């Protein structure tokens, strides 16, 4: 059910990719384990059918409750796919300075650090879903960049991927940003309006289409290693077990 009116048009994702092919401890991550993507809540019925036919059995929705209220769950709600709502930011409005909202690569890196510290329990649950769902798990936020990028990084760290490979995967979204912004504009515009932000003004202060996206993810990984040594320390403290990591690695390398 939606509580905010918006002209919601069903469309195919523009930032969807299987994480298969990335080098991890012991080999290469297989396809069909984890899919990162932009919003799945308003995909077309054909896309929903294709994802399920391709082995999708679980969806991890990292968006805030308000974002979910804007879109509902869409065509995938009609399929036998487990749905896990695990907001990494409970209130998007509270995560930003209303007087000086900063949408820069550096600001995103700081926000990612706050996500890992503040939403570690949700990240642990998400990793358990990926570890134990019988098929493929797809995880998404709105754009498939920030919250999705943080979960992808935690998954790849658990699998033993190198920081450079994690950053490279994250930066692939850069080529899709124009399409992402076009696809998400109606939903994000409705959300910003509901939160009391001026969407047009936010767009003018954003520099996310400029420079290198690497900065944000590199900042997160460097900070985690500097603060903890083991970048998974915040998640371990929140309950991430060696058994879950072992299960993830077993599934990631399975033929």
What are these regions (language model features)?
Residues 143, 147-148:
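Ser/Thr-glycine-rich phosphate-binding loops at phosphate-binding pockets of nucleotides
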